[in-house]
């Protein structure tokens, strides 16, 4: 009888211990969203001079509101070092504010970050997959960012075009200079931002276009970028035809900015 009692007690204790062990087991967080981001120096606004680094990042969002980021850069200069990485708010031609500091660790060209308890509003925007958010990785030599990439609707073509009066045909004498940022995204949208500074006080910007033509020649308008002075310095979005998209990606083209005093063009720059 005593032996039987001891056996039952032993079984009861084992059951109790197993039950406790099950209760102590914490469910592992599950991946609820995974994103692959293409990174490139060409996506920076503007592209850092002489830099061609590229890479990719894998972003995972978990059910417990944690996020991991694993990124690798290719071609990072041996004289440069990665320093910071953030998520920023902004479309492909905008440099926007930091919305989340990744606080990563760096090993050469690799970036690793794990963030716990990320705010729900940010997690929800990532899950929705429509927000204008980009990953920006900074370095010692390029503090503003050495590579970047949109989390959604990736950039498939990028050009940062320097504009000057010397590029006009014939050349124009002006204090004005500028930059045209051009980005074509995966949904075949053309994002552009044309900025001109130091324009003479007696002049005013009027319009800007992409024209066909190699350096030293004048050509026809391919597509408009700015139709009034108010369009300069702000993001413009066009939906070009497939033929225009292909031309922007491959042909000899230039950006031309027109003004009241220089109707044929005050500053210009070649896309290629």
Describe these PLM feature segments:
Residues 1-4, 21-22:
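Positively charged n-region of N-terminal signal peptides that target proteins for export
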Residues 6-14:
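Sec-dependent N-terminal signal peptides
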Residues 21-85, 89-208, 212-272:
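Metal-centered catalytic cores of metalloenzymes
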